[in-house]
């Protein structure tokens, strides 16, 4: 009721119909959200008003918070992982913006690499074209167009999700300027002698015919063939015990036997000689039982050695200086060379036989040990995974990753069996094996000439840093094992480890995860043998094998790439870059391209340092490091690490101050999503069915730091939670209908105790939400907000004060009673605080809420964090850094522990009363709690229990609840002693309706 004239009230008294004398909440804000239809309209309004530019202008000159976007791959529609990742980033940016900071967001995309090449090659194959017959410039143009298509597609999908940012100016790694920056960063490594060309075993994909970075590899459980192979020792060390002695090796990669060059033993390992049929077989003593179990039943053509006796034990060091014959030594040539026994500190007795066959072509330990002993790779396996056609054994017969090639009845095992060297072969060994994360095919270690960044070479161009004394709290201290060396110029590994120790990780376990990876990683393989990527822009002297390191040449190359992109790197322009000082005929132009992880690892240089995005330039001229990198936990071995190594190698520090990681999204049953399982969930479909705000609420409600789930039932629960939050705002809008400044009470001390209590709870919520933002704990943020709305407001405060809201207004109280004025004043504070708190989570709904009350005002996303003193005086403008008065008021409200404890006990009693009333309601003894009369022990004298419990009367005495005999007020429906008959008025209603 907004009309305070007395005529309707007089008629109500005469007719007994008081409906028009009570206040009924009124709002145009509907309970049914209709998000899929409404959100695009709100988004269009934001775009039309250029909201992003308004936000940037409003925060110009403020303290900065810079989140640097890890670029998603420009290939395919947005998936649920993209959605979660970008919602979290948006939450970071919006909460920092809400706190008054200048928090720009520049989205980016990773545009080079093999997956795009594959898709373009597919298009060529459909046209009956061979990619190798197409000019490389044309092929790259197709790749560029393909990437741009998916950039445009994903951009619209992310905008629909409500992600704010500079969408008109994203960064793309295929921009010419970005490609030039990547080249410049590469040439910094070259200038500082931090590149080398070498032949080392690297992860290689025979299907994709290229080297892979560790981050491009995923591990899958497979079943492999395991074999035991006997190598005859050239000079029998135990002639008094056996006629011949054999060293037995075990492997799950039979295809590597053709390039065996040595056998490794453990010097301190105890070995056993098993005698059977006059022959002796050497295995680790601890593995005799396991080995003999594999040897039963015996392979055809071999002796039954599964039951042989151990006739001698000896230390591995006794094998030093001895040699063995390759099982296929009869082929002559390479196979006829003696295979030396070499001591290897990596040899264990965990599995196998305790002896390891060595091939420098196909293993890191193998390569290092063989190289130290003068054994070089033979490069027998080619890029497609086949042995060279001219290789004496198995040349050109099949890919080494082919199951049949390695099978017990395949060519390798068959030939070993014919040679009498195969002791056991079975296709039953289950283990985890590396696969290409793109093609899903198995990868191998293959020794090829590649370009590397050394991890353990001293970087004389980097200033040494003293060890940091302060550690991040509650993270278990430092993990840097190299701190004692940091008084000198560091290696890349040392610099990276120190940078890790200087970085904040959320969750904290991320520190040890990336630290252990960096501590144990090999040199960084930069080169790839593909076409779509940034070239390794080096000229190598054909005589010396050294790459040219000339700043003028480097500058010309960078300038050309900035103007024409990667196509600028061509033979036709080689002399142009070399200038008059060098002859192009004397130099090899490298045609390999860079690892795409180097591309993305350089984005900090392009995005944060170039000045192309002025909002990202530090106002204080300080470090270019981002405040935060935020990606999935798999990026500890991907973007987090490549960015770290690139930045430490060129700048001596990490490109980030903090790293936040999230887990993976599983289906409702906890299974990994995959197209083959048919359990993928499209965020595009979810936005169509539920709306983006539901998807956002889900993402910010789960514990995203761990793997989490999504499914229909889960989303139904989220939708229910959304409805409760929406209903809270609907109630606030309706209850504040007609609220005026004249009605407002700003003196908290003059308010009823319940209002003071609610403001204390709000202040407590505010402090906890601020802490959640500082902790990046958005699960807690959303839970706190929802619990406050559901438990403290809807189920408690709103419920209690409905009577005051509806009935404490009339001709005698045109502004309402003091209690009603205080209630509506607090509701106004709640509205302006909660709409701000909810804005980063429910970006569309909060805009709808704000626009419903203030249709001519600007966007809710221009508001700042609530300042309580300002909120109480002028809630609509009550944002920004807290004033001194606000800080004092916040402190007073938050520090009222006695009041909060008192009301916690009252709420506990209220819950007990509600529990005791419920049986009477179920039995239909009463229809509502207003008809109940309650007896309480230890009733406090200063509390209006009838109001708190929403009951008729409350007496002191033993616990009891009964139906009251009091009559019901015809206006407020309360059953009170002063009501003389049903339909008559209580004292309060008489008073507010009496204008005299």
Question: Which stretches of residues belong to each language-model region?
Answer:
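Intrinsic disorder/low-complexity segments
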Residues: 467-468, 473-489, 872-898
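Short metal-coordination and nucleic-acid-contact micro-motifs, chiefly zinc-binding Cys/His arrays
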Residues: 201, 432, 537, 965-968, ...
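Cys/His-rich microdomains that often coordinate metals
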Residues: 443, 548, 976-979, 993
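Acidic, turn-prone loop/beta-hairpin segments
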Residues: 110, 202, 206, 212-220, ...
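Phosphate/diphosphate-binding loops
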Residues: 407-433
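A broadly conserved sequence feature marking short terminus-proximal activation segments
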Residues: 175, 396, 401-402, 545-555, ...
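Cys/His-coordinated zinc-binding microdomains
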Residues: 973-976, 987-990
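Structured secondary-structure scaffolds
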Residues: 13-115, 168, 177-184, 239-271, ...
């Amino acid at each position: 009721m907004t009309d305070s004239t007395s005529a309707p009230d007089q008629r109500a008294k005469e007719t007994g119909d008081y409906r028009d004398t009570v206040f009924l909440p009124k709002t145009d804000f509907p309970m049914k959200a209709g998000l899929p239809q409404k959100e695009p309209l709100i988004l269009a309004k934001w775009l039309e008003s250029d909201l992003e530019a308004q936000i940037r202008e409003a925060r110009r000159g403020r303290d900065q918070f810079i989140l640097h976007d890890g670029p998603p791959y420009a290939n395919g529609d947005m998936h649920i992982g993209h959605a979660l990742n970008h919602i979290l980033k948006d939450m970071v940016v919006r909460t920092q913006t809400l706190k008054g900071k200048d928090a720009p967001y520049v989205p980016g995309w990773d545009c080079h690499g093999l997956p795009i090449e594959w898709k373009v090659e597919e298009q060529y194959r459909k046209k009956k074209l061979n990619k190798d017959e197409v000019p490389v410039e044309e092929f790259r143009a197709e790749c560029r167009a393909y990437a741009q298509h998916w950039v445009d597609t994903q951009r619209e999908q992310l905008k629909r999700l409500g992600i704010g940012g500079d969408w008109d100016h994203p960064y793309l790694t295929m921009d010419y300027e970005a490609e030039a920056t990547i080249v410049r960063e590469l040439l910094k490594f070259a200038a500082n002698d931090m590149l080398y060309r070498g032949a080392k075993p690297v992860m290689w994909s025979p299907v994709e015919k290229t080297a892979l970075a560790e981050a491009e590899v995923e591990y899958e459980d497979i079943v492999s063939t395991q074999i035991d192979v006997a190598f005859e020792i050239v000079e029998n060390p135990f002639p008094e015990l056996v006629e011949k002695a054999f060293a037995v090796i075990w492997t799950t990669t039979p295809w590597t036997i053709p390039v065996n060059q040595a056998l490794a033993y453990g010097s301190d390992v105890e070995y056993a000689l098993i005698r059977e049929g006059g022959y002796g077989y050497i295995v680790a003593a601890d593995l005799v039982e396991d080995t003999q179990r594999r040897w039963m039943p015996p392979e055809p053509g071999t002796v039954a050695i599964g039951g042989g006796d151990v006739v001698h034990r000896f230390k591995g060091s006794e094998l030093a200086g001895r040699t063995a014959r390759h099982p296929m030594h009869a082929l002559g040539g390479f196979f006829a060379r003696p295979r030396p026994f070499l001591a290897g500190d990596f040899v264990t007795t965990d599995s196998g036989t305790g002896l390891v066959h060595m091939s420098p072509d196909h293993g890191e330990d193998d390569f290092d040990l063989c190289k130290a002993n003068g054994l070089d790779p033979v490069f027998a396996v080619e890029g497609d995974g086949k042995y060279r056609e001219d290789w004496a054994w198995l040349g050109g017969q099949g890919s080494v990753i082919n199951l049949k090639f390695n099978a017990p009845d395949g060519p390798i095992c068959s030939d070993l069996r014919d040679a009498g060297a195969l002791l056991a072969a079975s296709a039953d060994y289950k283990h985890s094996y590396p696969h290409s994360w793109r093609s899903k095919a198995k990868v191998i270690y293959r020794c090829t000439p590649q370009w590397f960044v050394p991890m353990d070479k001293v970087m004389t161009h980097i200033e040494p840093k003293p060890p940091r004394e302060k550690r991040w709290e509650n993270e278990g201290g430092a993990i840097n094992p190299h701190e004692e060396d940091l008084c000198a110029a560091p290696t890349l590994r040392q610099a990276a480890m120190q940078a890790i120790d200087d970085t904040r990780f959320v969750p904290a376990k991320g520190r040890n995860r990336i630290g252990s990876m960096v501590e144990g990683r090999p040199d960084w393989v930069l080169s790839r043998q593909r076409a779509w990527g940034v070239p390794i822009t080096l000229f190598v002297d054909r005589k010396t094998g050294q790459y040219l390191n000339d700043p003028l040449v480097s500058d010309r190359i960078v300038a050309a790439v900035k103007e024409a992109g990667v196509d600028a790197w061509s033979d036709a322009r080689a002399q142009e870059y070399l200038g008059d000082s060098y002859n192009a005929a004397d130099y090899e132009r490298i045609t390999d391209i860079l690892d795409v992880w180097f591309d993305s690892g350089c984005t900090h240089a392009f995005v944060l340092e170039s000045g192309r995005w002025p909002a990202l330039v530090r106002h204080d001229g300080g470090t270019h490091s981002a405040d935060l990198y935020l990606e999935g936990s798999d990026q500890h071995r991907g973007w987090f690490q490549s960015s770290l190594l690139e930045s430490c190698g060129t700048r001596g520090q990490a490109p980030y101050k903090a790293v936040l990681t999230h887990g993976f999204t599983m289906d409702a049953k906890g299974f990994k999503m995959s197209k083959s399982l048919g359990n993928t969930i499209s965020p595009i479909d979810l936005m169509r069915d539920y709306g983006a705000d539901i998807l956002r609420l889900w993402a910010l409600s789960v514990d995203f730091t761990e793997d989490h789930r999504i499914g229909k039932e889960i989303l139904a629960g989220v939708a229910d939670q959304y409805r409760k939050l929406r209903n809270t705002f609907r109630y606030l809008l309706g209850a504040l209908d007609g609220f005026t400044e004249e009605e407002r009470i700003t003196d908290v001390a003059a308010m009823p105790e319940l209002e003071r209590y609610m403001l204390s709870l709000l202040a407590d919520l505010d402090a906890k939400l601020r802490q959640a933002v500082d902790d990046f704990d958005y699960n807690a943020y959303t839970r706190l907000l929802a619990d406050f709305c559901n438990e403290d407001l809807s189920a408690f405060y709103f419920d209690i004060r409905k009577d005051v809201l509806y009935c404490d207004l009339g001709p005698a109280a045109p502004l309402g009673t003091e209690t009603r004025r205080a209630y509506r004043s607090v509701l106004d504070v709640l509205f302006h605080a909660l709409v701000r708190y909810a804005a980063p989570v429910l970006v569309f709904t909060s805009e709808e809420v704000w626009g419903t009350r203030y249709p001519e005002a600007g966007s809710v996303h221009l508001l700042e964090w609530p300042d309580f003193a300002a909120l109480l005086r002028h809630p609509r403008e009550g944002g920004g850094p807290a004033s001194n008065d606000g800080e004092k008021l916040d402190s007073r409200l938050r520090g009222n522990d006695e009041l909060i404890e008192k009301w916690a006990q009252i709420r506990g009693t209220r819950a007990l009363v509600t529990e005791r009333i419920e049986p009477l309601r179920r039995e239909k003894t009463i229809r509502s709690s207003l008809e109940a009369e309650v007896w309480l022990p230890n009733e406090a004298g200063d509390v209006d229990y009838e109001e708190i419990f929403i009951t008729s009367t409350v007496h002191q005495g033993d616990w009891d609840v009964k139906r009251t005999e009091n009559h019901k007020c015809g206006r407020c429906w309360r059953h009170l002693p002063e009501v003389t008959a049903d339909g008559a008025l209580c004292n309060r209603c008489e008073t507010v309706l009496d204008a005299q």
